[in-house]
Every structure is written in C-alpha cells, then in structure tokens.
Amino acid sequence: MSSDELKRQAAAVALEQVRDGMKLGLGTGSTAKHFVELLGAKVQGGLQVVGVPTSEVTRADAERCGIPLATLDEVDHLDLTVDGADEIDPALNLVKGGGGALLREKIVAAASGRMIVIADDSKLVETLGRFPLPIEVIPFGLAATRRAIEQALAVCGIDGELKLRNGKDGHAFVTDGGHWIVDAHLGRIPDAPRLAGLLSVIPGIVEHGLFIGLASSVVLASPHGIRIIERPACRDSGESK
C-alpha cells in the first residue's frame, strides 16, 4: 500500500468526525489535500459546512471541490481543524510547515475547538527534529535573526544548521504572508516546548513550525490498519475519537 493510499485512509477516518453545520479549518499539504477532496465529495452530497483554508493552495483546492469558504474574520469560531504534519512525537507535539503554510496553519489551529492530525505512520517519531524545523522570518535583518536562532539552539544544547529555503525559481521561497523561511536542520530536539518558547520571543521570527499542545488527536494509517492517539488532556475530558 502506497504512502498516498495511507494518507487517504487517515483522511477518511478524520472525515467521520465532521458533522452538518460545522466550521472547519482546512490544512495544507499532500495529506490535508486528501481530506479536502473527500470533504468536497460529501458537500456535493448535501453536507453543509464552511471551511477556512490555511493557504492559497488549499483555498484553490477547496473551491475546485465546491466547499463553501470563509475567513477567520467571518466566523466566530472553528469547530475542528484537520491538517497533516511533518513529524509527530508521543506527546502529540508536531513539526509542521514543510509546505510553507505554518503561520496560517497555527493561527487556524489555535482558533479551533479541536485539531485532528492525519498522517501515515512514518510521521510518528520518538523525538522531533529529524525533519528540518521551518522558521518563518521577516527578510529585514535576517543575519541578526539567524544569530538569535543559533543562540536559542545553543541554550537547548542543539548544534544545528540553518538554511534559507529557496523556491523553484532558485530565489528565496516567499510565504503567503510575504515572509521567508529558514529551515533548521537539527537532527534532534530534546525539549521541544523549551525551544518553542525561546524561538517565540525572537524579534524577526514571525512563527515557527513547533506546534505544542495544539493537536487533540492523531489519526495514523499503516499497512496494518488505523491507529488513533489522543492527547492525554483530551482523553481526561472525555473527548470522543
């Protein structure tokens, strides 16, 4: 079974949580695209939902699938966000942003009552850091921002390499918000919450790809079946899978 087939299976399980009248955050990336396509088929069958896309790419996909869309300014809350992840640890902390949409993804996730992460089982890791950590930055003063990032990494005992992400044209990749992305190749992040806190206070950083405490549950698809992992706080509150 291909990775693409596994992603679609995970998306189908997440779709079971969608109810008529919900306001949904629509993630970005190859896995989230499967969810958007499956959701679109349900909408064509009469399901009534409103989606808030996390990128212009997702907006185009959702429009193509006939999903009614809104902005966060036009809805008072989001019931659920469904999105993928580049890495997931056992505490359901995430690395996201490989597709470059981390800022809007985090804003939408934080505005949601629940966040379901969908992925194939290769994304579950013991410790975050194997996948490069995306850090969205302001172009102005980039050298100073890089030095501050390096200092934060040193405080956490991490010796990493920072690389400015380039687009297909060979120039700096530009996010939907007009920013650049520095990918931090770290190998291992021993204390993700601590690093997230240090990065969050650096002037010049718009947002980083560590999603701490935002995922309510994770749907992992493997050749052996579906595994659902819930964040302990969600289990304690009786939140349904």
Curated annotation (Swiss-Prot):
GO molecular function: ribose-5-phosphate isomerase activity
SUPFAM superfamilies, per the entry: D-ribose-5-phosphate isomerase (RpiA), lid domain, NagB/RpiA/CoA transferase-like
Annotated keywords: Isomerase
UniProt entry tagged with the keyword Metal-binding: no
Gene3D superfamilies assigned: 3.30.70.260, 3.40.50.1360
Binding site for substrate: T28, G29, S30, T31, D83, G84, A85, D86, K96, G97, G98, G99, K123
Pathway per the UniProt entry: Carbohydrate degradation; pentose phosphate pathway; D-ribose 5-phosphate from D-ribulose 5-phosphate (non-oxidative stage): step 1/1
One Pfam match: Rib_5-P_isom_A
Top-rank EC class of the record's enzyme: isomerase
GO BP terms in the entry: pentose-phosphate shunt, non-oxidative branch
UniProt-annotated catalytic positions: E105
The reaction(s) this protein catalyses: aldehydo-D-ribose 5-phosphate = D-ribulose 5-phosphate
Subunit and partners: Homodimer.
The protein's role, per its UniProt record: Catalyzes the reversible conversion of ribose-5-phosphate to ribulose 5-phosphate.
Protein family (similarity comment): Belongs to the ribose 5-phosphate isomerase family.
The name this protein goes by in its record: Ribose-5-phosphate isomerase A
Taxonomic source organism: Rhodopseudomonas palustris (strain BisA53)
